[in-house]
Amino acid sequence: MSKTMAMNLLEDWCRGMEVDIHRSLLVTGIPEDCGQAEIEETLNGVLSPLGPYRVLNKIFVREENVKAALIEVGEGVNLSTIPREFPGRGGVWRVVCRDPTQDAEFLKNLNEFLDAEGRTWEDVVRLLQLNHPTLSQNQHQPPENWAEALGVLLGAVVQIIFCMDAEIRSREEARAQEAAEFEEMAAWALAAGRKVKKEPGLAAEVGSALKAETPNNWNATEDQHEPTKPLVRRAGAKSRSRRKKQKKNSRQEAVPWKKPKGINSNSTANLEDPEVGDAESMAISEPIKGSRKPCVNKEELALKKPMAKCAWKGPREPPQDARAEAESPGGASESDQDGGHESPPKKKAVAWVSAKNPAPMRKKKKVSLGPVSYVLVDSEDGRKKPVMPKKGPGSRREASDQKAPRGQQPAEATASTSRGPKAKPEGSPRRATNESRKV
C-alpha cells in the first residue's frame, strides 16, 4: 500500500470513528490469519516504552491482501519518537501517522493569516468560546504539549469556518426570500391590473359611450338643422333696390326661398309705397335677361305665389270699372288697336274677373290687349311665369307717367294710353288686390 493511500485511509477512519488524528496511528502489513492476541503482543514490544496505547479496530485491505489496525496513543506520547517500521509476523509492519512538520507549516500559515487580519489567538479563543488557562497566562510561551494546542487550534478554525458558512447561508436565504417577495409583489400587481381591466370605471364607460357615437349622426343633425346658407346669401346680395326695401321695412325678415311666409309683408309694402314695388319689378326683370342662375327663377316664383293668393282672397264684388272693362273686351281691344298701346287698368280688370268667376274664365282661352296677349285658363295658371314685357324706348317715359298722384281712379286711367308699345303695364294683380282692400 502506498503512503498516500495509507494517509487517506487514516484520515477517513479517524473521521468515521471520531478520533483525534494527532493521536492516532495506522499499522499496515499484518497477515490475514494473525489474531488479536498476537497483534497486541507485537505492538506491546514497540509502543509500551513510549506510553499508553490501545487498539481501536482492524480492517482488511483488499489491494494488499493484508490487515490494517487503528491505534490510539495517550496524551503524553510524542508521535515523532515512534518508529515508522518494525518486524512482525509475515514480514515488516509499517506505521503511518500525521507528520509533525505538516502541523508546523500549518501553524505558520495560520499565524500569517491572523497577522494579516489583525487578529490574535485571544480573539480566536473568544470567538470560539474556548477558555484555555495556559494560553491566557502564557501568551508568548509555547505550550508544553504542542500537539494538544494544535488540536485545539484546529477545532477553533473548523468552528470559524462553520460560522462563516452559516452566515453566508443566512445571507443567501435572505436574498432568496427578498426575491420571492419581489416575485409575489409582481404577481399581485399583474393580478390587480387584470382586475382593473375586467372591471372598468366611469372613465371607461364614458369612453365606450363616446366610441358609440358615429360621425354619420353628427352629419345628419347638421343637415337637418343647418339652414340653406347659399340661398340666403344670394337673396341678400340680389340688388340695391331690395336692400333699400329691407331697410325701409324693418319688420320684414329674409326668408329662405323654399318657405315663403305669405303675402302679408309684400301687400303691406305695396300699400305703403306702390312706387317701390314697381321699381322692384323693374329691377328683377333686368337680371332675368342677363343671368341664367336658378336663383332668379326661385325669386320670381316666390313673388308669383302671393299674387295668385291675392286673387282668391280679394273681395267678392270688384269695382264697377273693372266689371265694365271685363264684360266688354272687344272695346278694349279696339281702343288698343287705335292707339297701339295698352292701358294699365285693363290688366287689373282681368285679374278681378279671374278672381271673381274662375270657372267661366276657362271658356275664354285668350284675351288680346293690344300687342300683349294673356292666357287665362285656370287658377293654376297664376303660378306660371308671366310674359315679361321687353324694354323699349318708351319705358322710361311710362315710368315717369306712373309717378302720378295716388288718387287717380281706374276710369281715368283707361282713357290715357302709354306711348311705348312694349312698356310694362302700371297695374298688377298684387296692386289691384291692395286697392280692393283699401276700398
UniProtKB/Swiss-Prot annotation:
Residues 208-439 are annotated as: Disordered. Pfam families: PNM8A (PF20847), PNMA_N (PF20846). Residues 231-249 have a biased composition (Basic residues). Residues 314-326, 395-404, 423-439 have a biased composition (Basic and acidic residues). Belongs to the PNMA family. PANTHER family: PARANEOPLASTIC ANTIGEN, PARANEOPLASTIC ANTIGEN-LIKE PROTEIN 8A. This is Paraneoplastic antigen-like protein 8A. It comes from Homo sapiens.
